[in-house]
Amino acid sequence: MSPARFTEITGRYPALHVVLIGDFCLDRYLEIDPARRETSIETGLPVRNVVRVRSQPGGAGTILNNLVALGVGTIHTIGFCGDDGEGYELQRALRTLRGVQTSRFIATGYRRTFTYCKPLLMHRGTPPEELERLDSKNWDPTPAQVEEHLVDSLQEASVQAHAVIALDQVDHPDTGVVTARVRDALGHLAAARPDLLVLADSRRGLGGWPAVGFKMNAAELGSLLGGQAPTLIDDVKLQAGELARRNGRPVFVTLSERGIVGALPSGETEHVPALPVRGPIDIVGAGDAVSANLAAALGAGADLRSAMELAMAAANLVIHQLGTTGTASVPQLEEALGL
């Protein structure tokens, strides 16, 4: 990608409207000082003393953080949190982010706030040591009245959208934001607006999804097509191309250290290698950075390869940020690409 092309694409970000619908969660980091370890007088069990607590939006919020870091002008968030303390923290964090519209993000007593609580042992001079995570989730189906709000919000917000991102983060179907009813609404939107990028990613794979843009890994691609995960790049390109033509929508397949493959319904396929790794890494959040950068770039009119190059640069920047779920800004991308 030339410097002029990079500037042309990223220069359009402030004018973009991106809709982000999905499972927003609260990432809460508990920083523990191992030197302050005590023993409980009452139970005799070890006590870990938390010296700092920091919280940030996770799940779909990680995609949001990356869109904000890119300088996307307006981001419409659609989702829910619980009417609880974690929900208050999450809403407060969302409202502080530049360009983020939260009027369609609701707190409801019918749901708990999806929370990842991550205890970290802080060792001087070395990366944090992550202990067992504590999760808070919903286990019952999302109520119909909440689904109705989500579908109505999607229809309203997408009118002026340049791109829509949908993230299904929950392990149990229909307990989060992207229920079967919401997936149907996304399919209807994509059919009605063939020029609009609707990019979907799901923790459980994209089987049963309507014809929208897909972002997945090789194992998910193989499973979706009823076979094994393709191992050769040419096979990934072939299968991604077949799926893109079948759905009439773009397909992106992440390949970890081997980069990413993208395919368009027109038959165009590309492979962009990953950038080199430098020292310790943490892959958490890399996939969300890829989603954000693909959507922003394609929404801004980027060609397939340019969008994928930006996504790979973002992923490389994010994995080198330890002890947090990182982001990548436009100046950082420019430096990473050597422009």
Report the location of each language-model feature.
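A short, aliphatic-rich alpha-helical micro-motif
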Residues: 13, 158, 207-209
